[in-house]
Amino acid sequence: MELYIYNKELDLLGVLDTANAVIWNRRYYAPGEFEVHTAATEIALYLIQKQYIVAKPDSVEFGIIENVIIEQTEEGEFIKATGRLGSSYLARRIVFETTIISDTVENAMRTLVYENVINPDIADRAIPNIELGTLNSFAETVHFQVSYRNLLSTLTGLAETSGIGYRLRFDPALQKFYF
């Protein structure tokens, strides 16, 4: 399987085509996890770095490398890279202000992402290259208040309560993520 590897600036660094195993666990209400096992070749050592992005060619999902372990076996050196899927980016923010929402769950999620990731009051808190995607017009409604809680935990709670999943999608051509 080919895996495309991007740096933090979303530039394509190369294609990893030597993976012995790729485990890609999706979750509907939260970010999933992934694992990549490959021989520790020169190119693999260059491509497999913490915070780099792993994308499959047939999917809009992507993973963020969080841990890299180099293992020595009788067959040689191997790399084990693990991480979470793209929505885990949202764990890097808290809901900074007291927010009261009475709207559809979908709009509530979009509002939280917009106000805390895309266009926060404190510009330094913005995460670049994340935009809102297409509105799906789900009808489920919610009435809640949240403050100083992790954004990802808040979204996961809304998803589990309402039955509406979420994810960040990656568009490598535009170098953008869409919520």
Describe the predicted segments one by one.
Residues 44-56:
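Short coil-to-beta transition motif at edge beta-strands of beta-rich domains
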